[in-house]
Amino acid sequence: MHKTNSITICVPKMTVFETAVNLELWPRILPHYRYIRYLERSPGRNVVVMAATRSGIPISWTSEQIIDRDRVEVRFRHLKAFTKGMRVLWTFQEVPAGVQVEIKHDLAFRVKILAPIADKIIGDFFIHHIANKTLRCMKSYVEANTNKVTA
């Protein structure tokens, strides 16, 4: 499964990046996120339990977050459940209209015969939808609060 979501946000690149890496902020600015719980925490690596909803359906997963400040990227690796092994890459590219934020999800389903069905349910219904909503809400937040967000 390969899913890509992107959006252009009209604020400085590091403002968007710092907002994206600040997982504690997510439940306050992303209404579909119920909570983020840290299991391990350090400046460049965290292990978290993330919980969101999709059309009222609660879901949660455990991820390792790697913050790469040199490359200005955020990587996640799902550690448990149906999405175990999924790799997620957030990139931030300056473009004339602002910053192009892209989220790429890559997952090889463990049960190959179920992959087409899992792609529709896990990939399209959950992941693609939640990532789009995350980007839209993050855009609204950072564009409305540019002077309040620390880069």
Explain the meaning of each model-derived region.
Residues P12-E18, F126, I130, T134:
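Short amphipathic alpha-helical segments
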Residues P27, R37-T83, Q100, N132-A151:
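Glycine-rich portal/gate segments that line the openings of hydrophobic small-molecule binding cavities
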Residues H78-N132, V149-T150:
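Beta-strand/loop substructures that line and gate deep hydrophobic ligand-binding cavities in soluble
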Residues C10-K13, D70-R71, V95-A97:
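Short loop segments at secondary-structure junctions
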Residues M1-G44, K148-A151:
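Hydrophobic ligand-binding cavity/cleft-lining segments
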Residues S6-C10, R37, A51, I66, ...:
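Generic structural detector for well-ordered beta-strands
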Residues A20, M50, V88-W90:
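A generic structural signal for ordered secondary structure
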Residues T4-S6, S60-E64, R87-L89:
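Well-ordered beta-strand positions in beta-sheet-rich domains
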